[in-house]
Amino acid sequence: MQTNKQPKQQFSEKQFIAFVFNYIAGFGFISVVMTMFDVGPFSYLVLGLTSFAILGVVLSFSRLSVLCGNSAYGGSYLIAKKAVGTNSKTKRFFVFLSGWNVSLTGSFNGVVIPAVLIFSFADIPVVKANNNIIIGLLVGGFLLFGLLTFISLFGLKINKKAIFYFAVIKWIVVIGGFILGIYLIGTTNGKGFVENNLIGTRENIDFFKIIFISLALTIAFAGTEDLASITPDVKSNNLRKCFLIAFGCVVLLYLVGFVIISGLDGIRGYGLALGNKDPKAINNYGSIYRLVGGVPLLVIYGLGLLVNSLASRLSMTITTARKYVALAQDGFLPSFLAKTNKHNEYHHAVLISNLMTLLVMLIMVIIPFLPDHNNNNNSLFNAIEQLVTVTIEMAAAISLIQYFITFIFFFMIFAKKENQKLIPLWEKVSYVISFALVSVLLFVPLFPFNQWTVFNTFKIVVLICFYLLGVGFFGYAEWKNKNKYQLMNNNS
């Protein structure tokens, strides 16, 4: 029987910390870490700037989790309600905009799933060169997407078990790469530690390149804004501690991984005769496996990347569905989205979440048909790679928009006299610095007037269209519920 009651809490504190750590950390970092060394010694600056910016976001979410509590879904959406209230149309619009924006991140991140089989085995030459293999892997990716949608309908209890088993394989591959990396460092006597920390012949190291690489690194922290939306499922009286412990573990892992990888020789072909086409070039994390064990180890890596993507999508479905639930409970979206099935899962919200992802996929298909000077040979693999790159950049932009909005609401809440005493001076300073960093990382790449391409225009147009879709839902909700907003005020 369907119901819209609140499901019982499914996570203990330890389980939630592990869920947060597994949700954020892993392949997001290793997929972009190689690009950090394009700026030589400034790679440390990139890691520091990005980590500090996200730390401010985590601190704000953890601080607000104390103030707003964990009795309802919504995360940053609840923060917006706390900051401005819902007693006027303008206030309700900004509250809805916050909730709608954060719900888009899962849809854009989910686009990568059908392509994951291709990238899992991309280091095998025959995969890139054979369009039939690429199409077959793409079809397999869509079948996996459907399977994950089916699994996610069985509630957190089943999802937690699936995520756990997927996570075990994922971390074997990640840590295995670190160990193999140490082995490779030994074979070159640590040459990379010097090579990767010199500017040398690297070209065009400037402010914009550092900012763009920092933006790419925010992908390694993707999902931070999602996790506040599932706090009602956590049995904890100290969510702030949970967030900070998990984030500390993520940063520690990244620091260890960064130090190890910085010792590798030939990252992205630097210093090699044939550049990134040299057989010894380490162009991605899978190259570490290939250099040590050839194709057999590379296949193991590919399976690990695949499993990680499956776990990420399951986790993403859990968080994204609950964002729709919060909007539905307040009348902005149809009320049936707040109903649960016999497994205590918001099955309608899960299905809508995946339908939104499919909608994004259909729109992103336009990308390969846009003029691209880097794909003159019309390679199918390069076209899919460009599609995924642009989509991930859009997902990163949406996350940064959410951080930006949340900071504004955060400052509004703690500008009130009764809340000012809750925050020590050092924490206030960190928020201001983090807000400045988030602003730079958001607006400079989104409007790179010195390097504008057709892809920048495409990204902005698509984002505007999705926001207009949200405005349509808001307008309909205003018309339908114009006499019912007292219910929302009672929940504010």
UniProtKB/Swiss-Prot annotation:
Disruption phenotype: Not essential, it can be deleted. It is found in: Cell membrane. One of its GO terms (biological process) is transmembrane transport. Its main location: membrane. To M.genitalium MG225. It comes from Mycoplasma genitalium (strain ATCC 33530 / DSM 19775 / NCTC 10195 / G37). It is a multi-pass membrane protein. Keywords: Cell membrane, Membrane, Transmembrane, Transmembrane helix. Gene3D superfamilies: Amino acid/polyamine transporter I. InterPro entries: AA-permease/SLC12A_dom (IPR004841), APC_superfamily (IPR050367). The chain crosses the membrane at residues 16-36, 39-59, 107-127, 133-153, 162-182, 210-230, 243-263, 291-311, 350-370, 394-414, 429-449, 454-474. This is Uncharacterized protein MG226. GO terms for cellular component: plasma membrane. Pfam families: AA_permease.
